[in-house]
Amino acid sequence: MALGIRAEPAVFDEEFADEVRDQLLTMDGVLVWVDPLHEGKSREVLDPLLRDVAARGPWVSAHPDVILKMGVKEVLYRTKHLGWGADTHLYRTPAEFHAALPPRLQSAGPRVLKQNRGNGGQGVWKVELVSAPAGKPSILRVLQALRESVPEELPLAEFMTRCEAYFAAEGCIVDQPFQPRLPVGMIRCYMGADRVVGFGHQFIKALIPPPPEGPDSPAAQPGPRIMHGADAAPFQALRAKMEAEWTPQMIEVLGIGAASLPIIWDADFLYGPRTASGEDTYVLCEINVSSVFAIPDQAPAAIARLTSDRLRRTRGD
């Protein structure tokens, strides 16, 4: 209430979607935290509802149309020419996938395949070629990013058939090189619209084979995400690139107006190869828009200020 904002919760489920729509239409603005996939459910009912609400006047963040541009793995392909990019490829059909993946695995080493929409490591695979004997099926070693996953070896054709489900509902698969510095950790850059509001560093275990003790052992669990403010010294080079270069370039490429950027979103970076002078580089591995939490302690104040500003614009104050 310090900024004059009266907030109230709105709990969504498909069974009472109409009641939620009626509630949202009485609001000036709506902040949305809903995973793209959760316990077998998707946003196929929620997203049209939010589009309808936004068309009738209330401001919605993040708008579903913005999520479809930013918060999907395809953004890794569309922005691969930016400084955060890598040798990224996109497969829109099973035919493209079957034609391009086998030679790429032979020539480019381990890859990471990602379904377009998902969370929690669902549909994200480290894939590497084990053997490709002449006249016999090629064998892969694959590891999914889901917690407690274990590596498995199987024929290439069998794995590609398994992945065909990711093309349903106009889906696609993004293909990136595996980053060898993954054990160094991941940096989550928290954004309030086009400004950095904090960072989180975490030693992740996804796509790393579990220790001998097993995938459910303490040693196999990810470390805590250590939160930092936007001014944290270790991340100032990344902050400068995000604010001055990469975010402006991204919204231009994606055709997103600056005023449509989500109030809170984050970009996950892995450490790329060091430069000749020993400086770190950063490779984007995901943008999260649909349900960003937890957040640094400094972020809520920035979210509140941005929300207040957007609401004033919506009302024409």
Regions found by a protein language model. Give the residues of each.
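Short, solvent-exposed loop/turn segments at secondary-structure junctions
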Residues: 14, 36-37, 67, 117-119, ...
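Hydrophobic alpha-helical segments and helix pairs
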Residues: 78-136
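Phosphate-binding site of ATP-dependent enzymes
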Residues: 109, 121-122, 126-257, 270-273, ...
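C-terminal active-site "lid" helix and adjoining low-complexity regulatory extension at the edge
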Residues: 237, 241, 251, 255-266, ...
